[in-house]
């Protein structure tokens, strides 16, 4: 029975929630799958099949985040075409998409835990394609803003439930690499977007950025529709019970629980999950705030790059776009280090005993504190007109450190709540993180006008420095907090 569900792989999940699947294992004498090695159980899938599903959701997430900033270089063209003179409205043509990341998961993540991941992936992709077409053929700014926001809501689907898919098919001790690949989308996508979008806008126009996104989304959508399979264990077991009366007898606990609630009650309970997690779990709240600050910092830096590398260092428009690669290289190096160390450290710390989610915070403790150093290096080197390689190295340090906050933070939430509630935990994280990405960039101009690049980035460095004790706190007291502040889902 060790391979029956993700809940079995997550010993700490029981302290967080009353999982129907966990109840099934402890209270029923029979394995709900009929066989602990059943091929129907996603945890028992062959490695190539698991890797394919991780790759698809990771590419889906990367594409969704590419679209967040790929349009940004073309925003001035849209502003000119639609006669936009208000700088805030122009900024909203980019930021509203990211704001959609906060609202979409509130419905999509709970629905995936009730009705399955696959139907949400397919529905989100179809809706996303439709709204992307709307963006590409918009005839006025109001039409564009509405479609842009709705695109963000649809794009949030894979970001909020992808972690659930990873948890569905990978045991805890193998989850680090898979989650690292999945979590790279929100980090690397916004970095690569402006580079690609800059050349697309330069040689075509802003509408072509959406046509390229449309092509990419169509390919991913077809792959999802024809090759992906459902991974949610609870949904698969319910379907199994409906197919076979014999299986239904072994699932009486789960079925009886479901029958006590109407569909609307089940949906309301599921939708309120992310809010309950934020309100009653200090772990979810502080991890979400920490990742939100880092996510917002990255988007804020994007607004300064044209000013710094064109205004201070004299880069042309095309070359200045390559400055974004500093962040990207730092994140890529961080990904390599994380992939090598994450699961290895978990195994070493386990030492034959029960592993704990807090062991995922070790790398955050080690590398998170270097992010403020990158802020200071970037800001003051640009302020004093030091050679351009120095501020780019500063952004690389920011990218490296940010990765070791965002990815371990997400894995910690997934390991803490298990496959049954991973999507809701990540939805809570997105609910906090996305507004930082959407709106923090709007304060860049007044911040730097008043404080200069040096002190402005120092303020950002001090803010990130204030959050560095968070992983140390949870590494020491996380298990106690999870036991004391139990979120009844």
From Swiss-Prot:
Cellular compartments annotated: Cell membrane
Primary location class: membrane
Stretches with biased composition (Basic and acidic residues): 1-12
One Gene Ontology CC term in the entry: plasma membrane
Segments traversing the membrane: 52-72, 91-111, 127-147, 149-169, 180-200, 208-228, 282-302, 321-341, 361-381, 388-408, 425-445, 454-474
Topology term for the membrane: Multi-pass membrane protein
Expression induction: Expression is regulated by the Yap1 transcription activator, the Hog1 and Fus3 mitogen-activated protein (MAP) kinases, the two component histidine kinase, and the Skn7 response regulator.
Region (Disordered): 1-42
InterPro entries associated with the record: MFS, MFS_dom, MFS_trans_sf
Annotated Polar residues bias: 16-41
Any one GO molecular-function label of the UniProt entry: transmembrane transporter activity
Ribosomal protein listed as a keyword: no
Gene3D superfamilies, A to Z: MFS general substrate transporter like domains
Disruption phenotype: Displays profound hypersensitivities to cumyl hydroperoxide, potassium superoxide, many singlet oxygen-generating compounds (eosin Y, rose Bengal, hematoporphyrin, methylene blue, and cercosporin), and the cell wall biosynthesis inhibitor, Congo red. Also increases sensitivity to copper ions, clotrimazole, fludioxonil, and kocide fungicides, 2-chloro-5-hydroxypyridine (CHP), and 2,3,5-triiodobenzoic acid (TIBA). Leads to smaller necrotic lesions on leaves of a susceptible citrus cultivar.
Glycosylation (residues): 83, 86
Keyword line: Cell membrane, Glycoprotein, Membrane, Transmembrane, Transmembrane helix, Transport, Virulence
CDD domains, sorted: MFS_Tpo1_MDR_like (cd17323)
Family membership noted in the UniProt record: Belongs to the major facilitator superfamily.
Function: MFS-type efflux pump involved in the modulation susceptibility to various compounds including cumyl hydroperoxide, potassium superoxide, many singlet oxygen-generating compounds (eosin Y, rose Bengal, hematoporphyrin, methylene blue, and cercosporin), and the cell wall biosynthesis inhibitor Congo red. Involved in oxidative stress tolerance, colonization, and lesion formation.
Protein name: MFS-type transporter MFS19
